[in-house]
Curated annotation (Swiss-Prot):
It comes from Enterobacter sp. (strain 638). It catalyses: (2R)-2,3-dihydroxy-3-methylbutanoate = 3-methyl-2-oxobutanoate + H2O; (2R,3R)-2,3-dihydroxy-3-methylpentanoate = (S)-3-methyl-2-oxopentanoate + H2O. Keywords: 2Fe-2S, Amino-acid biosynthesis, Branched-chain amino acid biosynthesis, Iron, Iron-sulfur, Lyase, Magnesium, Metal-binding. Gene3D superfamilies: IlvD/EDD C-terminal domain-like. Binds 1 [2Fe-2S] cluster per subunit. This cluster acts as a Lewis acid cofactor. The gene is ilvD. GO terms for cellular component: cytosol. Its EC number is 4.2.1.9. This is Dihydroxy-acid dehydratase.
């Protein structure tokens, strides 16, 4: 029988000092022997996805204590990628994932907590907490802050839906008036919550639900809706049940590695491909799999991408649907239901409720359920009122979107595309692969060949795009922006956005060893591996080189002979200590970022630390 980890600090005469300190936090004799459950919050006033979380940790803690546990809350950091975008702040975004994972490990292991409730929401916070959960392998439940309501405004006598990316595009488009740009800016992000499209934050919260580590509805139920409070209340109750199942009943099925096993990872990636999720999810799932010691690689993702159709299309891939619409159509379990009926899922997986996939679908798939309360929950909709408060409204759609022919979520027979929303490409400068969000690529440019315009930094590329130096037919190459080369693997949302602003969204390609925001669409290919700073052939591309992109056949090729590639690599090596580094780039890199770069691996490994350098 497993022993409560917390007993290390609460039992025995030699722990009198530790108990004295616990007493100073409010614990009493009756509490010693109860499970100590960490409430891992990520409240911050910097991030709209987290601005409403201050009181939610207390809400969970009260339920834990009412259910027989002891709750102890702490906070992690949280970076807002949108605010950090387009300047040196973006260098810190991906490295913050590792800091979050480490800080959770430090706090939980230092104080011998028995289990966790992770209150996450945005881009690097959910992945960081997920990595820590699988690293620690103690009972855990995720409950996120929830999606933002879509922005809405009236343009040309028509009400349209908006999000952050629309504000960025309008702000950079010289044809848009100051008044219209200001109107869109003020309307784009109306409430607390993670940005309203299928961007990285919402993608990861959906995948955490698919992995089985959060409750039904968690990935799609709006932050502002009163129904979301129940997810927090039940998380507090259920984590105590889960904890006791493991420690008191010796039931290892309660542990995250046994819930989020390889079959669950395959299901999560299948969901991601079907819903056209952010390319960043590939990075984070690969990293989480390594923490779980699961053999899940780019090769697995490639195989899935070739057989999974696209069943859901959401902003930024279409302006028609946002997360509030996904929820109305049944949320994560609505998509999983269609995938299950198509025979594309592993059915033996279980979630934190102890339900198998078929049992979950029977109860929570709107196409199957007989439960009126479940149907009511999925009718939870937006109020259209600006607010930073959680659970502040109780509006509902009159009907569910169960139209699987033309609705937000489609059946296999009516798929948006028989090709999924993500694809892995391979070629002579992406030997270990690269990623493209095919859901956001226009059919006219699925095959594309053009001359390279090469830039050693995102900043130089942005200047060239806005300065008219990039023209239709070009392939923009931005390198030395990978995990090691950046360092920090910046998101390239500004270059892709500005290509659209300049009318080049369907006329150019962009390739990088960096990554993209979940808000990116267009022919944007990232995660090129190996990255330039690790000796990847992306470093030897020169202006004017022809690059061929063939998404249907999963290929990407620099049109050079093997002999010319070898000669250029020799020339690069001949630069000595300057080899595989950017030329003439002026960038201040702090010691914290240098430490990150020293251990960083390329994107095909999830940009995790190179354990071989640590003796691991």
């Amino acid at each position: 029988m497993p022993k409560y980890r917390s007993a290390t600090t609460t039992h025995g005469r030699n722990m009198a000092g530790a108990r004295a300190l616990w007493r100073a936090t409010g614990m009493t004799d009756d509490d010693f022997g109860k499970p100590i459950i960490a409430v891992v919050n990520s409240f911050t006033q910097f991030v709209p996805g987290h601005v409403h979380l201050r009181d939610l940790g207390k809400l969970v803690a009260e339920q834990i204590e009412a259910s027989g546990g002891v709750a102890k809350e702490f906070n992690t950091i949280a970076v807002d990628d949108g605010i950090a975008m387009g300047h040196g702040g973006m260098l810190y975004s991906l490295p913050s994932r590792e800091l979050i994972a480490d800080s959770v490990e430090y706090m939980v292991n230092a104080h011998c907590a028995d289990a966790m409730v992770c209150i996450s929401n945005c881009d690097k916070i959910t992945p960081g907490m997920l990595m820590a959960s699988l690293r620690l392998n103690i009972p855990v439940i995720f409950v996120s802050g929830g999606p933002m309501e879509a922005g809405k405004t009236k343009l040309s006598d028509q009400i349209i839906k908006l999000d952050l990316v629309d504000a960025m595009i309008q702000g950079a488009d010289p044809k848009v008036s100051d008044a219209q740009s200001d109107q869109v800016e003020r309307s784009a992000c109306p409430t607390c919550g993670s940005c309203s499209g299928m961007f990285t934050a919402n993608s990861m919260n959906c995948l955490t639900e698919a992995l089985g580590l959060s409750q039904p509805g968690n990935g799609s139920l709006l932050a502002t809706h009163a129904d979301r409070e129940q997810l927090f209340l039940s998380a507090g109750t259920r984590i105590v049940e889960l904890t006791k199942r493991y420690y008191e009943q010796d039931d290892a099925s309660a542990l995250p590695r046994n819930i989020a096993n390889k079959a669950a990872f395959e299901n999560a990636m299948t969901l991601d491909i079907a819903m056209g999720g952010s390319t960043n999810t590939v990075l984070h799932l690969l990293a989480a799999a390594q923490e779980a010691e699961i053999d899940f690689t780019m090769s697995d993702i490639d195989k899935l991408s070739r057989k999974v159709p696209q069943l859901c299309k959401v902003a930024p891939s279409t302006p028609k649907y946002h997360m509030e619409d996904v929820h109305r159509a049944g949320g994560v379990l609505g998509i999983l239901g269609e995938l299950d009926r198509a025979g594309l899922l592993n059915r033996e997986v279980k979630n934190i409720l102890g339900l198998t996939l078929p049992q979950s679908l029977e109860q929570y798939d709107i196409m199957l359920t007989k439960d009126d309360a479940v149907k009511s929950m999925f009718r939870a909709g937006p109020a259209g009122i600006r607010t930073t408060k959680a659970f502040s409204q109780n509006c509902r759609w009159d009907t569910l979107d169960d139209d699987r022919a033309e609705g937000c979520i489609r059946s296999l027979e009516h798929a948006y595309s028989q090709e999924g929303g993500l694809a892995v490409l391979y070629g002579n400068f992406a030997e270990n692969g690269c990623i493209v969000k095919t859901a956001g690529v226009d059919d006219s440019i699925l095959k594309f060949t053009g001359p390279a315009k090469v830039y050693e930094s995102q900043d130089d590329a942005v200047e060239a795009i806005l300065g008219g130096k990039v023209v239709a037919g070009d392939v923009v190459v931005i390198r030395y922006e990978g995990p090691k080369g950046g360092p920090g693997m910046q998101e390239m949302l500004y270059p892709t956005t500005f290509l659209k602003s300049m009318g080049l969204g369907k006329a150019c390609a962009l390739i990088t060893d960096g990554r993209f925001s979940g808000g990116t669409s267009g022919l944007s290919i990232g995660h090129v591996s190996p990255e330039a700073a690790s000796g990847g052939n992306i470093a030897i591309i020169e202006d004017g080189d022809l690059i061929e992109i063939d998404i249907p056949n999963r290929g990407i090729q620099l049109q050079l002979s093997d002999q010319e590639i070898a000669a250029r690599r020799e020339a690069q090596d001949a630069r000595g200590d300057k080899a595989w580094t950017p030329k003439d780039r002026q960038r201040e890199v702090s010691y914290a970022l240098r430490a990150y770069a020293t251990l960083a691996t390329s994107a095909d490994k999830g940009a995790v630390r190179d354990k071989s350098k640590l003796g691991g």
